Amino acid sequence: MSHVKAFVKKYWITAVLIVAICGGYWGVTHAGLLDSVLFPTPERIWKAFMTYADTMPLNFTSSMALLIPSLALGTVIALALGVLMGMNRRVRDTIYPIVYAISVVPAILLSPFALHLAPSFTAASMFLIVYNTIWATLFATVTGIMTIDKRYLDNAATLCLSGPRKLVKVIVPAAMPSILSGFVTSLRSSFLVLVFAEMYSAQYGMGYFVKKNADFGLYDNTWAGFLFMILVLVVVMQIFEKIKNHLLRWTMD
């Protein structure tokens, strides 16, 4: 019961704002103040959602099958390179300008090259998501390691920790707040790239569903798919927030 009260206390203002936004949208659409094609009424959106209720889970699993491996691979690359750059000043000074120059190129601009060079459309889509995932997590890892409180390193020296043990026991945990902050940015932006990536290789997927219906001018379906994607993103972010709080339970709130 205490958890329910805490949840209500934390999110009641959010709930009021959501109800106000939905009520406002209902009012302006029924009053004819917006284009009825681009902005269908909530009833039409709900009807479209119920029509494709059986398809939505399939779209979800298809998107996750593309997104999760890509996120995992991108995160591994970002952590490996970020730790190397963060701990070795010479490596950092040598490759940081190159990494920074590459990172400013949007993933979408690389799509023509990915489509021509990748062995399949799926591989091209995964490359775009991996590429997009790397940079925020990479730079956050470098920053987190570079700004570690010197007391942590002194304590590690006192305990005679070095090499992999020092990395796992001291450096990575101390840099974890920064790393997770960067990963949140990567996670959010990956959904945007997912929509673009699914244009090429998907027959199902949340982004594919939205783009396909938008191309055909079926905006009832487009809104239904769009809101479903938002719901998924909110749930994913809440799950990650729980994981982050567990990993950072040793820090101050």
Language-model features: locations:
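Transmembrane alpha-helical segments of polytopic membrane transport and secretion proteins
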Residues: 1-19, 238-253
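Transmembrane-helix boundary motif in ABC transporter permease subunits
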Residues: 69-99
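C-terminal transmembrane helix and the adjacent membrane-cytosol boundary/short C-terminal tail
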Residues: 89, 146, 181-184, 223-253
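Generic hydrophobic transmembrane alpha-helix motif, especially the helices
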Residues: 100-136, 143-144
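Transmembrane alpha-helices
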Residues: 127, 131, 163-197, 240
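Short helix-to-coil transition segments within interhelical loops
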Residues: 145-151, 155-175
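Non-cytoplasmic
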Residues: 182-231, 241
